[in-house]
């Protein structure tokens, strides 16, 4: 199947995101409230995670095994990442828009975060772990990277209890779109 990458990026740039429904039909979604991971002093994480970070058990990489991160994110009992969406992520990766931010323990993929980068916006699509704390360490290290690279926003799309522990917060759609417009003008790059 042919996909128009420019149209897909335009959809994300307008504040929408792709998801498959229970019948694997792909569609564009938006929400009245959007969840952001703070890139300032509001970002936080549990003290127990600081101990894990201090142990330096994990190393981080970008796009070392993009396909494995997509597969890890999609490998759930119920998933919104259909085969079609996995193919779109692969094409976005090949064209420089999709990234995997990974944690590794030795030669084993421990966890990762799948995201789309447009300007200074990191749009987090999904995350997973194979080794406990793998995705949490990825979150902390990704926020550090986004700060270093002067990103404007880390869009997590929808709130969940896991994200709340990192200081995630909701903003209204109008405020989100204003911030997104600013992010799109930023020359930030992940690599």
Swiss-Prot record:
Q: What is its EC number?
A: 2.3.2.6
Query: What keywords appear on the UniProt entry?
Result: Acyltransferase, Cytoplasm, Transferase
From the UniProt record, give one GO term of the biological process aspect: protein catabolic process
InterPro entries recorded: Acyl_CoA_acyltransferase (IPR016181), Leu/Phe-tRNA_Trfase (IPR004616), Leu/Phe-tRNA_Trfase_C (IPR042203)
Q: Is Cell division among the key words of this record? A: no
Provide the protein's localization.
Cytoplasm
Q: Does the keyword Transferase apply?
A: yes
Q: Which domain of life is it from?
A: Bacteria
| Major localization class | cytoplasm
One Pfam family here: Leu_Phe_trans
Q: What would be one Gene Ontology cellular-component term for the protein?
A: cytoplasm
MF GO annotations: leucyl-tRNA--protein transferase activity
Reaction(s) the record says it catalyses:
N-terminal L-lysyl-[protein] + L-leucyl-tRNA(Leu) = N-terminal L-leucyl-L-lysyl-[protein] + tRNA(Leu) + H(+); N-terminal L-arginyl-[protein] + L-leucyl-tRNA(Leu) = N-terminal L-leucyl-L-arginyl-[protein] + tRNA(Leu) + H(+); L-phenylalanyl-tRNA(Phe) + an N-terminal L-alpha-aminoacyl-[protein] = an N-terminal L-phenylalanyl-L-alpha-aminoacyl-[protein] + tRNA(Phe)
Q: Which top EC class is named for this enzyme in its record?
A: transferase
Against NCBIfam families, the record matches this protein to:
aat
Job description of the protein: Functions in the N-end rule pathway of protein degradation where it conjugates Leu, Phe and, less efficiently, Met from aminoacyl-tRNAs to the N-termini of proteins containing an N-terminal arginine or lysine.
* Family according to the record: Belongs to the L/F-transferase family.
Please report the name of this protein according to its UniProt entry.
Leucyl/phenylalanyl-tRNA--protein transferase
Native organism: Nostoc sp. (strain PCC 7120 / SAG 25.82 / UTEX 2576)
Lineage at the top is: Bacteria, Bacillati, Cyanobacteriota, Cyanophyceae, Nostocales
């Amino acid at each position: 199947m042919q996909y128009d990458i420019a149209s897909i990026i335009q959809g994300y740039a307008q504040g929408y995101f792709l998801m498959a429904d229970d019948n694997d039909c792909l569609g564009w979604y938006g929400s009245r409230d959007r969840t952001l991971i703070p890139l300032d002093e509001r970002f936080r994480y549990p003290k127990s995670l600081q101990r894990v970070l201090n142990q330096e058990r994990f190393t981080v990489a970008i796009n070392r095994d993009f396909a494995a991160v997509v597969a890890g994110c999609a490998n759930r009992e119920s998933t919104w990442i259909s085969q079609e969406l996995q193919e779109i992520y692969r094409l976005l990766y090949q064209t420089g828009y999709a990234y995997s931010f990974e944690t590794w323990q030795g030669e084993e993929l421990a966890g990762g975060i799948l995201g789309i980068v447009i300007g200074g916006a990191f749009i987090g699509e999904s995350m997973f772990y194979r080794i406990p704390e793998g995705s949490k360490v990825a979150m902390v290290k990704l926020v550090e990277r986004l700060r270093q690279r002067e990103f404007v926003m880390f869009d997590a799309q929808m709130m969940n209890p896991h994200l709340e522990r990192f200081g995630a917060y909701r903003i209204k759609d109008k405020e989100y779109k204003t911030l997104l417009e600013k992010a799109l003008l930023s020359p930030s790059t992940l690599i």
